[in-house]
A protein has these predicted regions:
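Conserved G/P- and acidic residue-centered "switch" motifs that form tight phosphate/ATP-binding loops
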Residues: 44, 65
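Active-site alpha-helix of zinc metalloproteases
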Residues: 39-40, 61, 93
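Aspartate-rich (DDxxD/NDxxD/DxxxD) Mg2+/diphosphate-binding motifs
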Residues: 57-62, 68-69
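Short, hydrophobic transmembrane alpha-helix segments
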Residues: 19-30
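Structural signature of hydrophobic alpha-helical transmembrane segments
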Residues: 30-38
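A feature for the membrane-embedded catalytic helix bundles of lipid/isoprenoid biosynthetic enzymes
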Residues: 1-9, 13-16, 35, 66-223
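A generic "structured core" feature
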Residues: 17, 39-42
Length: 223
């Protein structure tokens, strides 16, 4: 079978689903889920590498890759929110940010804009650096991987009747929880930061059109 970026993305989502399904089913299942989490993040890098090196990058493939990212993010953060390890507002934030940016990207594509070149939705260098550069995508993937794996290890080591560390001292537990909070909210902050260029450029693209439509409606409404 010939592997394509889209097939790798589909495999990544399946691996993510299996990882989340394993969490909460005992220490060794939790550890296996952590390994699968690393594999899912690695597959994210692999589909991008295939697209670039094999010249398989397409607008549809880019949208499928983004869809895979959203599914992975929402699956993991929703699970950890349900079991009380992160704030419920965290998956809400990721979902809202993803819905807003994906909506604007869809409008931009429909209006004839692309993700690159002279007709790109993000013409400013700082927007491309935050959203599309390799360092930004790599850092974001690393933050998510560290966040998901840390929470998974915490689940395996300190929670459940067969936790590897059993009952830990309150000071140790507080330290573990503090690190988890720093990791999760740092990931959320970088997620919002990467979404800002899309929101700003989307507003610049479509706000004038919305004003024009409203202006055309006003005389008709007055009549």
């Amino acid at each position: 079978m010939r592997w394509t970026p889209n097939k790798v993305t589909a495999l990544r989502v399946v691996v993510g689903f299996v990882a989340v399904a394993l969490f909460g089913h005992g220490t060794w299942a939790n550890l296996a889920a952590v390994v699968l989490t690393v594999a899912a993040i690695a597959l994210d890098a692999l589909d991008g590498y295939l697209a670039r090196s094999k010249h398989m990058a397409t607008p549809l493939g880019a949208q499928i890759d983004i869809l895979g990212d959203r599914m992975i993010e929402n699956m993991f953060f929703t699970y950890f929110a349900v079991v009380g390890m992160v704030s419920l507002w965290l998956p809400v934030l990721f979902f809202a940010r993803g819905a807003a940016t994906d909506f604007l990207r869809g409008l931009a594509v429909k209006a004839g804009h692309s993700g690159w070149g002279a007709n790109a939705m993000l013409p400013a260098w700082w927007g491309r650096a935050l959203v599309a550069s390799r360092w930004s995508r790599g850092l974001y993937a690393a933050l998510k991987c560290a966040c998901f794996c840390y929470l998974g290890l915490e689940l395996a080591l300190t929670r459940g009747p067969v936790a590897l560390l059993g009952t830990v001292a309150s000071e140790t537990h507080l330290t573990i929880r503090t690190i988890a909070q720093i990791l999760t909210w740092s990931t959320a902050a970088f997620c919002l930061l990467r979404g800002l260029p899309v929101l700003i450029e989307g507003w610049k693209l479509f706000a004038p059109e919305a004003v024009a439509v409203r202006a055309r409606k006003s005389p008709a409404e007055a009549a």
